[in-house]
Amino acid sequence: EKDENLWVGIVTGAGDRAFSAGNDLKFQAQAGGKMDINIASSGFAGLTSRFNMTKPLIAAVNGVSMGGGFEIALACDLIVASTNAKFALPEPKVGLAALAGGMQRLPRQIGMKKALGMMLTGRHVSAEEGMHLGFVNEVVEPEKLIEAAKNWARQIEECSPMSIRATKQVAYENFNEPDLEKSM
């Protein structure tokens, strides 16, 4: 946010196996839902509890994106996924809940019924299904993932940074305003 030379960011995992597998949910469940982990006030990866980011963020999802990892991806503005990406909020399978924004963001992005279908079952969703559901913007082969994310970033960089920031701000601030006139 503070770097004036940076207009857009890309968040990705190391390697091709996982974007982020999230917390060790079985260990956390065995600990009664409590773990001695230090999560910044800005949330997982410094993103899930930040609601006023002015610069666009692109999640380049390579492989597994589960639990907190999926919540990180959902906190980004765009998701580009490799064909081997898998998404889920599996917390209910071990007696936990996705408390880093996943339960709030997913229904807003794909609708309540589709989101509940994922959240109440903890089922895994492929990149293709994620695109069909509406939370993935593009699906590419794993070796093309970073280049595809950079392509989205280049398209954003071709626009005015002030216009991009204003567009993002207005879109997020008015997302839940049902009255069109009030949202204007």
Where are these regions (language model features)?
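Short, structured loop/turn "capping" segments at alpha-beta junctions
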Residues: 112-116, 125-132, 160-165
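A short, well-ordered alpha-helical element
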Residues: 1-7
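Glycine- (often His-adjacent) and acidic-residue-rich active-site loop
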Residues: 5, 13-53, 93-96, 175-178
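Glycine-rich phosphate-binding loop at the start of an alpha helix
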Residues: 22, 44, 67, 100, ...
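Short, active-site-adjacent cap segments at secondary-structure transitions
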Residues: 16-20, 66, 88, 171
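Terminal peptide-recognition signature
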Residues: 11, 24, 73, 106, ...
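CoA-thioester-processing core
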Residues: 44-54, 60, 66-120, 133, ...
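C-terminal long alpha-helix characteristic of the crotonase
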Residues: 80-85, 136-184
